[in-house]
């Protein structure tokens, strides 16, 4: 049996595990932590995406991107869906290895949000590498491997605040995606909401600290899928200015008032989605407190 721990930016500091015997450490590392590290030297490096974020800290997207790419540059084996080489290294493209059709046919993943399916593909790619390269186990039937792995993973309890589908109240579905702290995450959340319900209207609650994201470069046309957007927080004016070309926008004093208005306008079959696209620190301690507040409001309904 192997000792495996998931640590790092998910809430368990790496330094707390220095004295523990761990065979495999799965470390989620942020751009802040990479920037402060002299070297990474991981066996497997997984880069899920590079989308504009934390520009208030890193000053430009190019600097932010160069920091994130160190995950691939300083690892022995790389997993990514980027379409180019970095520092002369080839990447293992998990998108090509596990094509969409193999996932769509699995009923266990039918209601998974899009970004979770991407994450699962990367996870399975890493698992396949570990089993074949480190454990000397040859996986002859990829479909069989996939079915067994998905069966196990689908039984896991999902983490809160990540496209968390809450109870259906009076025919309205409430979704807590407070972990969406940039616009690219919110775009994926809107797509996942449409997959969840093909017919109903989607009412979006968003806002907070934009962290100097440049909304000009975003695929904001997807906001046409939104019936109405309720915006609160520090940068609500800038967000409204960008999104009002695509959907109706309403400025709100805070999350509570945004929720109240969204609840009032929504009808049976609709979705009320909290996917802020911003940091929470202008009004909350973190995304967890923001998500818990939203869940409280839904529970009172």
Please tell me what each predicted stretch does:
Residues 214-270:
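C-terminal helical cap/extension that packs against the catalytic core
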């Amino acid at each position: 049996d192997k000792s495996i721990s998931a640590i790092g930016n998910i809430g368990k500091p790496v330094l707390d595990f220095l004295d523990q015997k761990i065979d495999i450490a799965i470390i989620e590392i942020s751009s802040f932590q990479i920037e402060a590290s002299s070297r990474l030297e991981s066996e497997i490096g997984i880069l899920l995406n590079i989308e504009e974020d934390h520009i208030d800290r890193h000053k430009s997207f190019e600097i932010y991107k160069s920091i994130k790419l160190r995950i691939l540059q300083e690892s022995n084996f790389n997993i990514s869906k980027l379409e180019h080489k970095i520092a002369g290294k080839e990447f293992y493209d998990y998108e090509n290895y596990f094509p969409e059709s193999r996932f769509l046919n699995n009923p266990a993943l039918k209601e998974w949000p899009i970004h979770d399916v991407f994450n699962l593909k990367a996870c399975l790619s890493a698992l396949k590498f570990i089993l074949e390269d480190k454990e000397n186990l040859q996986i002859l039937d990829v479909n069989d491997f996939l079915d067994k792995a998905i069966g196990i993973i689908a039984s896991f309890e999902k983490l809160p605040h990540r496209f968390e589908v809450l109870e259906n109240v009076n025919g309205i579905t409430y979704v807590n995606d407070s972990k969406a702290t940039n616009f690219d995450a919110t775009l994926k959340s809107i797509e996942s909401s449409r997959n969840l319900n093909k017919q109903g209207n989607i009412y979006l609650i968003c806002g907070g600290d934009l962290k100097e994201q440049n909304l000009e470069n975003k695929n904001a046309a997807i906001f046409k899928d939104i019936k109405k957007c309720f915006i609160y927080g520090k940068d609500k004016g800038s967000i409204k200015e960008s999104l009002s070309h695509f959907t109706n926008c309403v400025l709100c004093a805070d999350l509570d008032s945004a929720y109240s208005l969204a609840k009032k306008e929504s009808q049976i079959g609709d979705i009320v989605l909290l996917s802020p696209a911003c940091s929470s620190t202008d009004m909350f301690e973190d995304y967890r407190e923001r998500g818990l507040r939203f869940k409280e409001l839904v529970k009172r309904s």
